[in-house]
């Protein structure tokens, strides 16, 4: 049962990530999947570290809202 819930949560996260513009999705994945630093991501995308941090913060907020709507958080 836990494996089923984990798979469903993974699908919900993927569904959220699919709504993001490609660049933002790549930034999110590089930070939270591959563990790249904000500094390295900023260099790779020709952005400031602050711009990357702001985008990540907004995406985390969007993910939180999405997961609440899906019933994963209250």
Please tell me what each predicted stretch does.
Residues 1-18:
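Acidic, proline/glycine-rich intrinsically disordered inter-domain spacer in sigma factors
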Residues 13, 24, 38-39, 43-69:
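DNA-recognition helix of helix-turn-helix
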Residues 21:
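ABC transporter NBD signature
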Residues 27-31:
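A short pre-motif secondary-structure segment
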Residues 34-35:
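Flexible coil/turn residues that form the inter-helical turn or adjacent wing/linker of helix-turn-helix
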Residues 72-74:
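Intrinsically disordered, low-complexity basic tails/linkers immediately adjacent to helix-turn-helix/homeobox/MYB/SANT
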């Amino acid at each position: 049962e836990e494996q089923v819930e984990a798979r469903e949560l993974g699908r919900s996260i993927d569904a959220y990530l699919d709504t993001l513009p490609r660049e933002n999705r790549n930034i999110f994945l590089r930070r939270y999947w591959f563990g790249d630093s904000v500094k390295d991501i900023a260099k790779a995308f020709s952005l400031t570290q602050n711009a990357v941090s702001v985008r990540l913060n907004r995406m985390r907020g969007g993910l939180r809202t999405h997961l609440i709507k899906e019933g994963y958080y209250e």
